[in-house]
Amino acid sequence: MKTQRFLLLILFTALLLVFTGCSQSPEAKESPKEKAQTQKVSSASASKKNDLPTIKILATGGTIAGKSKTSTTEYKAGVVGVESLIEAVPEMKDIANVSGEQVVNVGSTNIDNKTLLKLGKRVSKLLSSKDVNGIVVTHGTDTLEETAYFLNLTVKSDKPIVVVGSMRPSTAISADGPSNLYNAVKVAGAHEAKGKGTLVVLNDRIASARYVTKTNTTATDTFKSEEMGYIGTIADDIYFHNEITRKHTKDSEFSISSLDKLPQVDILYGYQNDGSYLFDAAVKAGAKGIVFAGSGNGSLSDAAEKGAVRAVKKGVTVVRSTRTGDGVVTSNGDYVKNDLLASNSLNPQKARILLMLALTKTDDPRKIQDYFNEY
Ligand code: ASP
């Protein structure tokens, strides 16, 4: 009898243990704090796909963030925020983990040196994190090449940096922004895009910031790299077909980490009957450097040359570029003797970017000419 009661007790205890063990869920065994952490981790891992690259989109405004009724020329640039840009292209989530930051929201004619420095520092900071694989900057097309070249010279990273814009506002029929943005994210997440410096992606083409320029006021195929060529194409897949021969990004000598301003560099344009007073006015207004968009191979009229030489004598660095839109400006003759430097193949607006950065390091004309030959 005693043994029977003892066996029954053991059976009852065993049943109780089994029952309580089964009914207790794993969560019930955790403290509320642990439970919250578990949920957070699992919800994060549900939305984040670990095998996809992590891309940050830094938005600055422009037509890609513009709105109109249906017009492609009358619209307000820089009104749509970065979250709306991302929401408009949900397909991006299949190719990358994307998130956005609004740096500024302006038409690109209002991008100034302060914004360049802010953007450059932010891109550098983000890329220094092991959690970020690439950066996309959305930007107005008017001065896009200047910002792209600035990043090309100042961000010390070999991770992809892609600058993108659009020629039609987000509300236009057949807006080009969504597909350009999708392609930009695709390129920024591509392993093959590493080490190529800052890239510009529009209209299914990949261009180097060093070589590309805007060539047409309104057409969607406005960004061209006539002389040097595009470096790649996007036809669903990415096809790279050219290498960059100029120094950039992690091989660049220019650093902005401790800068809060850039030296004033102005651009003057050469034309028939121009005068030397243009140079005097720039010097008086505080220019430390002047880029001259000369005719042909960076030529100056006699009057302009007098003004340029006067500026050089006052310690201002003068660089000859060209208004032709393409080709190399060579160092030759009296121009060299008078320390009028040559922009090599940089157009005036990009020569200004390089000259600003060069002047943060030196005012030696020979050294600055070397920079123009190397970058
Ligand atoms: N005006 C515009 C801008 O540069 C043009 C564009 O984005 O295409 O912001």
How would you label these PLM feature ranges?
Residues 1-10:
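Bacterial N-terminal signal peptides that target proteins for export
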Residues 34-35, 39-124, 306:
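ATP/NTP phosphate-donor binding region
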Residues 52, 58, 65-68, 81, ...:
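Accessory alpha-helical/coil subdomains and C-terminal extensions
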Residues 164-235:
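Internal gly/pro-rich beta-alpha loop/helix module
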Residues 43-44, 49, 277, 302-375:
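ATP/nucleoside-binding phosphotransfer catalytic cores, i.e., glycine-rich phosphate-binding loops
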Residues 148-178, 185-189, 313-322:
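Short, acidic/small-residue loops that bind anionic groups at enzyme active sites
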Residues 137-159, 300-309:
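Short Gly/Thr/Asp-enriched flexible loops that form oxyanion-binding sites at enzyme active sites
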